[in-house]
Amino acid sequence: MKTMKKYIKTAFFCSMYWLIVQLNIANLGTRIPDKYFRQKYIIFKSFNFEKHGKFWNKWFYVRKWKHKILDGHQLNQNIYDQRHLMTINTDEIEKMIIETKRAELIHWISILPVIIFNKGPRLVKYINIFYAMIANVPIIIVQRYNRPRLTQLLRILKRKGERHD
């Protein structure tokens, strides 16, 4: 009984830790000015093996499950709400590309706090590593899948000269 109580207490504190840390990372991430995401950093580059996002769908079937991921705007009002996308124009697509970069960065950073569990008991460490991966990697994959497709759409719109609707 004492061991069970200890596990429940540990689970509670780990849950609170992740909730507080991830909400704070997301909140700080939304404060990064857009200008930093307009630059071409290598981390956001679509690599050759990704084949403009096709890799992610071929190996992870992204199209089948990406719509099931909770929209970050529901937890943090500062996160871009893509449901308000009324028109498809270059300004909106550029904003969506910026937000895919922001989301990817936030979720990469959100994995790092798992380091705190490095010295903890093996079970606690493995559960928290699993949680950090399962909570963040799917969102990173979706961003890496969507961004090249949005970039291609932006190129097409710019070629057609559609600046505003």
UniProtKB/Swiss-Prot annotation:
Any Gene Ontology CC annotation: plasma membrane
Gene Ontology BP terms: carotenoid biosynthetic process
Location of this chain's protein in the cell: Cell membrane
Transmembrane segments: 126-145
Short name of any one Pfam family annotated for the protein: CrtO
Keyword set includes Transferase: yes
InterPro entries: CrtO
Signal peptide location: 1-28
Enzyme Commission identifier(s): 2.3.1.-
Group of enzyme by EC: transferase
Superkingdom classification of source: Bacteria
Membrane topology label: Single-pass membrane protein
Annotated pathway: Carotenoid biosynthesis; staphyloxanthin biosynthesis; staphyloxanthin from farnesyl diphosphate: step 5/5
UniProt GO molecular function: acyltransferase activity
The entry's keywords: Acyltransferase, Carotenoid biosynthesis, Cell membrane, Membrane, Signal, Transferase, Transmembrane, Transmembrane helix
Family classification: Belongs to the acyltransferase CrtO family.
Primary role: Catalyzes the acylation of glycosyl-4,4'-diaponeurosporenoate, i.e. the esterification of glucose at the C6'' position with the carboxyl group of the C(15) fatty acid 12-methyltetradecanoic acid, to yield staphyloxanthin. This is the last step in the biosynthesis of this orange pigment, present in most staphylococci strains.
Name of this protein: Glycosyl-4,4'-diaponeurosporenoate acyltransferase
Origin species: Staphylococcus aureus (strain Newman)
